Amino acid sequence: MRKTNSVLRIAFAGCLLALLACGEAEQQASGQSEPIVNNVKGTLIDQTAIDGFVTSPNGPEAGVWVIAETDDLPTLYSKTVVTNENGAYVIPDLPAAQYDIWVRGYGLVDSPKVNATPGQSLNLNAVIAPNAAAAAAYYPAGYWYSLLEIPHKSEFPGTGPDGNGISPNINNQADFIRRVTSGGCLACHQLGNAAIRNLPNLFSGYDTSTEAWNRRVRSGQAGGSMTRSLVGMGDQRTLEMYADWTDRIAAGELPPIPERPTGLERNIVITQWDWADPTAYLHDVASTDRRDPTRNAYGKLYGALEESANYLPVLDPVANSSAQVPVFTEDPNYNPEPPAPMAESPYWGDEPIWDASTSVHNPMLDQDGRVWITARARAPQDVPAFCQEGSDHPSAQAFPLGRSGRHLGVYDPDSEVYTPINTCFGTHHLMFAEDEDNTLWTSGGGRVIGWLNTRQYLETGDAAASQGWTPFILDTNGNGRRDKDYVEPDEPIDPSRDKRINSGYYAVAPAPDGSVWGSNLSYPGAVVRLKPGDDPSITALTEYYELPLDDNGDPIEGFSPRGMDIDRNGVAWVALASGHMASFDRSLCLSPLNGPEATGQHCPEGWTFYTEPLPQFKNIDTPGSSEGSYYTWVDQFNTFGLGENTPINTGNQSGALLALNEGEWIRLRVPYPLGFYTKWMDGRIDDPAAGWKGRGLWATYSSRTPFHMETGPGTSSKVYHFQMRPDPLTK
């Protein structure tokens, strides 16, 4: 699987290392940065690069990171590379500036920072960690989180506050695990990083760690939602679980040791820019038209700030600068009061730092570079008449709607005009179909899925006429068409009629064949396929495929999806709370895809599972890991370099993107600042003829808590550009 020519490179680099050690290593051992001719490849030094060797008392340090950071540019900028087998490194394509350079790696502590400019060679001294605890401070959050002791299988179903403290609504251990990974707190921020595994001083005055945790989860504007999550699990038992975890860590318990980057992982180059502001948090980023990633080449990127602020952050990666685009609702007087902090925050005190009225969740670029977003256009209760019962709107006649909390909007960079778009259906994620109408499909509609014909909307400006929605109807009578007469979700299957289900989409992903896939949260969860038909409001049919369960209702392997995507072959790829990536291929199904038995558990053979590369929770003996990625994104067009249809998980506990390459994981780890956490990525090809330099993945720091990163309060969100060069020394 490893495609680099390692034998030749090892021999060549080994000879160079020996020559350099004789003639020049002594002059540079202290970090001296005089320009030289013979760099790590024995050629003239590139005037936009910094290179050298990393050594320690143990010899060359392979698979460690060399980081260059500067604040000389319009926004904070850094670039990170990995050393090869001989400890050699090359940091390419650096803008002219003064940089701090240092070494970070597993088994090390950070080396002293050395100042340098592009065009210099710089040998660096790595610093061996003085003890195991010092080394573990740099491990990904998921390694620490794997020390969590999940309640035993025998404790389920829960017996409530007067019993074992676990909610009686949780029937098995798997559903509990879902809530401690991507179905709970991990959906908003990383767990296991230093900010979480250590209790802040604000909570030091309590008699027990359980009491301290009870106070902790009430902090800040998210205190209410955190408290509700705990109550849903059974707050007393859950608080005891987390208190035990942090107590053991405080007493010196350490996690397993991660391996250093190897193989293709050493070819990764990561460039970072700051954007937004220290009190805002990002959700997603968009760089191009998903359907043609050569569009918007070298162009600006746009982000979404969800509940934190009323603007779109903008990054210009060529000018290394950031900006803001204001967004707003249709009613300028709609300005709801931001939620007050439930209790004092250890970072922000009693200050409410989030104040968005627009709730921008997800951006997407179209074929002309417009930025389409899911955003609030009006107050949720101000429902247009055309949405409701009695309207002549075709979708309302089929299935009228009431309130919805988030809608659509579009920003045109050419005219610099933003326009809110009032929709009847709620929205969350959005993605364009490959059709002549440039149909924008959305998730987040609950009982329905909604869409906007953007061609029609741009031509007419008529939002009502350009939108539509449909409920989710299973073809349970097996006649191959949708019938007007169907049974409701709370009614039993009738083999002579179709059935409506409440399988609201979380993710949404139009496929090349015109179908629209999505993920359904909960336990065991499902992927859902919608076939729109000629008139989706009345013709769309749904297929529903649950994660497989055994006769006891326990998972056969993985469970509980969150984000998902589709590849060019119509295979769905999904991130699971169980710590897996899974694929679902409906062409493998042996049973009928419609009829009275096609209600969820009818195609276990369509599923394949890939355990994410983190340790499993300490006391769990079932398949999975302590990961639980937020989203799966498929690189359909080889924007990164691992090939078409490469599925990539967001790796929220790994501090990395996790690319599945020929059945093996490639970890695109972000070592600095610790705490990388993203909810989405995008891939763009800026120049198809430029090799690795003309393509790459884009992501943003998406946690609600940028102040949890190692750089602490004052840290803003970041944009990350991941690129993969042919070898670690390519400039």
Predicted segment positions?
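Beta-strand-rich domain onsets/edges
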Residues: 24-49, 53-59
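The canonical Cys-X-X-Cys-His
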Residues: 181-193, 242
